[in-house]
A protein has these predicted regions:
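A conserved beta-strand element that flanks and buttresses the S-adenosyl-L-methionine
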Residues: 3
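Hydrophobic adenine-recognition pocket in adenosine-nucleotide-binding enzymes
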Residues: 7
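A short glycine-rich, Lys/Arg-flanked "PGG" loop and its adjoining helix->strand segment in the class I
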Residues: 15-32
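Short secondary-structure boundary/capping segments
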Residues: 16, 46-50, 159-162
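Short, glycine-/aromatic-enriched active-site segment of Class I SAM-dependent methyltransferases
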Residues: 33-56, 60-62
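Short hydrophobic/aromatic beta-strand or adjacent loop that forms the aromatic wall/cage
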Residues: 84-89
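Hydrophobic, well-ordered beta-alpha structural blocks that scaffold small-molecule cofactor pockets
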Residues: 95-176
Length: 176
């Protein structure tokens, strides 16, 4: 059993990883991959998911192509609610092929929805800037809590600087 839990989005050279997996895979190998789901990212407007540490996002269609490259089949697929919406696929050589669910037909709309996302981002940006500027006017630069990689996207997108944020703090022993 080979598992990838929330790491597939971090892979820069997917073809190299797939080539290495081909070497490791035997007739009895099972590969379990879980990652954030492109459909959830789009439907929940999670545009901060797209940043330098996540060069890719995945759909069920993506995993059918990955399974094909590995000469494997998707045995099972589920959509855990973790992290705002994940996809988990189980690849194997020893099972009947997974029947493509109707959910995959929704993925045909992803491209159009991605194009519409820019309007949503522009509106979010305008509203968030207005909200923060109002707070800045009342309190001055604001302290912030935590700075995960995806926060860098938001700060850059909003073009914030020390006039908006005084400092960023992390709680001791904090996991978030």
């Amino acid at each position: 059993i080979i598992t990838f839990t929330n790491v597939f989005a971090h892979i820069n050279n997917l073809n190299e990883v797939l080539d290495c997996l081909k070497i490791l895979v035997s007739r009895n190998t099972i590969i379990v991959i879980e990652n954030h789901y492109l459909g959830s990212v789009i439907n929940k407007n999670q545009f901060d998911t797209f940043y330098h540490e996540h060069p890719r996002s995945y759909s069920l269609t993506s995993f059918f192509k990955i399974a094909e490259k590995l000469n494997m089949s998707i045995k099972e697929c589920s959509f855990p609610k973790r992290y705002g919406g994940n996809i988990r696929v189980i690849l194997s050589n020893n099972f009947n092929k997974y029947k493509k669910p109707t959910k995959i037909s929704d993925e045909n709309k992803f491209y159009k929805k991605m194009l519409q996302m820019q309007k949503l981002i522009t509106n979010w940006k305008m509203n968030k800037k207005r909200e923060i500027f109002k707070l800045n006017k009342k309190y001055g630069p604001l302290p912030a809590k935590a700075f995960p990689g995806r926060a860098a996207i938001l700060i850059k997108l909003l073009n914030f600087n020390n006039k908006n944020i005084s400092a960023i703090y992390e709680k001791n022993n904090s996991k978030k």
